[in-house]
Amino acid sequence: MTKMLAVGLMSGTSLDGIDAALIETDGAGHIRPIAFRSDPYAAQAREQLREAAALALSFDAPRPSPKIAAAEAMLTDRHVAAVRQLLAAARVEAGQVDVIGFHGQTIAHRPDRGWTWQIGDGAAMARALGIRVVNDLRSADVAAGGQGAPLLPVYHRALTAGMEGPVAVLNLGGVANITWLGAGEGELIAFDTGPANGLIDDWMLQETGSPYDAHGAFAARGTVDRAVLGAMLDNDWFDAPPPKSLDRADFTIQPARGLSAADGAATLTAFTAETVALALRHLPAPPRRLIVAGGGRHNPTLMKMIATATKITPEPIEALGWNGDATEAEGFAYMAVRSLKGQAISFPGTTGVAEPLTGGVTHRP
């Protein structure tokens, strides 16, 4: 199959920054990572995106908004700059790049209402860089009755090819999702498991002014409040079978209010771990290995709690020889290539769509 140079861009619901990756891939089994960079958002940009998301969630459906348009313009400019810096560091000319997979920023995800909203101007990016851009990768799936998430399973399948199954890949971003890959061809199940870093980050920002709990140190000093944890886990969403997906705002830190800063961090961290354990009940068989990607793998307190809750030792994705910080961005580069080739990026077992479906909108310079 034809190999392409592809850039992938990811800005997650944790609002920590932009991940940009350059890979060579055929959209199937060939993947060669070339370069990666991560650019953190300044506090002002983070707040602008947070306000845009809060506004979007108040709408019944996506509609024009000056505040959201301004956030989109800022976001697009930042992503264009990230691509230029990535290519300069890799000594790759724009003309050598076949496509950019531009996820954009999710500001509202409402598949139950038939829509999902990722801001990011793909046409403006294509003009600015002179490179084809594929964006809006989730909307086609939602329009076809799918959840629109998670999308990374198609990339997880490629990364774990050749491993003895079943294997699970757990992505700990703002929201957590799990991909289960069985021993047989086509055995692919994926769904959101619950909040991951999102609630912990919100708590830390409110209680300490820090955007996250570095190395889980704050949670490690606290004590889990079992009553609060039990109340948070008493939610029918965790019993619902997959496919299912979440908006980052579907759960809040409200139940932890009144706890000390450390105890709240410990309780919310335990909540993430316990929801991962609950998710394993929905899998056809326990995974032999639990591979962990996303920022949450840098939190040793969370990783220990996941091990205790699941009785499986979680392994950072680096155990496979991959850069766990780059996985999501690489995945969207991979999906952009598949989109150009008309190949599926979502499946009945991952989003609930009726049949394997491609996605994305292509913008030419």
From Swiss-Prot:
Entry keyword set: ATP-binding, Carbohydrate metabolism, Kinase, Nucleotide-binding, Transferase
Pathway: Amino-sugar metabolism; 1,6-anhydro-N-acetylmuramate degradation; Cell wall biogenesis; peptidoglycan recycling
Top-level class of the enzyme under EC nomenclature: transferase
Pfam families the UniProt entry points to: AnmK
Cross-referenced SUPFAM superfamilies: Actin-like ATPase domain
GO BP term, pick one: 1,6-anhydro-N-acetyl-beta-muramic acid catabolic process
InterPro entries, sorted: Anhydro_N_Ac-Mur_kinase, ATPase_NBD
Reaction catalysis annotation: 1,6-anhydro-N-acetyl-beta-muramate + ATP + H2O = N-acetyl-D-muramate 6-phosphate + ADP + H(+)
Residues holding ATP: 12-19
EC number(s) per entry: 2.7.1.170
Gene Ontology molecular function: ATP binding; kinase activity; phosphotransferase activity, alcohol group as acceptor
Function: Catalyzes the specific phosphorylation of 1,6-anhydro-N-acetylmuramic acid (anhMurNAc) with the simultaneous cleavage of the 1,6-anhydro ring, generating MurNAc-6-P. Is required for the utilization of anhMurNAc either imported from the medium or derived from its own cell wall murein, and thus plays a role in cell wall recycling.
NCBIfam families: PRK09585.1-5
Family affiliation: Belongs to the anhydro-N-acetylmuramic acid kinase family.
This protein's name: Anhydro-N-acetylmuramic acid kinase
Species of origin: Rhizorhabdus wittichii (strain DSM 6014 / CCUG 31198 / JCM 15750 / NBRC 105917 / EY 4224 / RW1)
Gene coding for it: anmK
